[in-house]
């Protein structure tokens, strides 16, 4: 298994699919990385040479991925909560942030139903 950005990449899958195991790299970005390095997207990781894996590692290193990206997203959410803006309040209360209805639905965000006390 190749190790890129601190993640074990599966050897038996195509390069594009294997790169998506890295947090912050989706299908589109994986295709861009393959195009920039000249690596065949349909080739399996086990068939790549060490130089090609190093090229992929260097190209992925140009992006914010894994722990840094998680930290960045959490800091942005925390900043919204500290500002006390509408989006921050919704995050703080554990409700949908992007304008979805909450009278019905939104069970994932709100958690399990709480019984009404009488």
Swiss-Prot record:
The keyword rRNA-binding applies. One of its GO terms (molecular function) is rRNA binding. One of its GO terms (cellular component) is cytosol. SUPFAM superfamilies: S13-like H2TH domain. InterPro entries: Rbsml_uS13_C, Ribosomal_uS13, Ribosomal_uS13-like_H2TH, Ribosomal_uS13_bac-type, Ribosomal_uS13_CS. The keyword Nucleus does not apply. GO terms for biological process: translation. Located at the top of the head of the 30S subunit, it contacts several helices of the 16S rRNA. In the 70S ribosome it contacts the 23S rRNA (bridge B1a) and protein L5 of the 50S subunit (bridge B1b), connecting the 2 subunits; these bridges are implicated in subunit movement. Contacts the tRNAs in the A and P-sites. Part of the 30S ribosomal subunit. Forms a loose heterodimer with protein S19. Forms two bridges to the 50S subunit in the 70S ribosome. This is Small ribosomal subunit protein uS13. The gene is rpsM.
């Amino acid at each position: 298994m190749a190790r890129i950005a601190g993640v074990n990449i599966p050897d038996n899958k195509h390069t594009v699919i294997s790169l998506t195991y890295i947090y912050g790299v989706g299908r589109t970005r994986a295709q861009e990385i393959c195009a920039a390095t000249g690596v065949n997207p349909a080739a399996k990781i086990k068939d790549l040479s060490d130089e090609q894996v190093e090229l992929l590692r260097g190209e992925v290193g140009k992006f914010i991925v894994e722990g840094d990206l998680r930290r960045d997203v959490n800091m942005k959410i925390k900043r919204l909560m500290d500002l006390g803006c509408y989006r921050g309040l919704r995050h703080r209360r554990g409700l949908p942030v992007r304008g979805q209805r909450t009278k019905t639905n939104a069970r994932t965000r709100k958690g399990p139903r709480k019984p009404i006390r009488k």
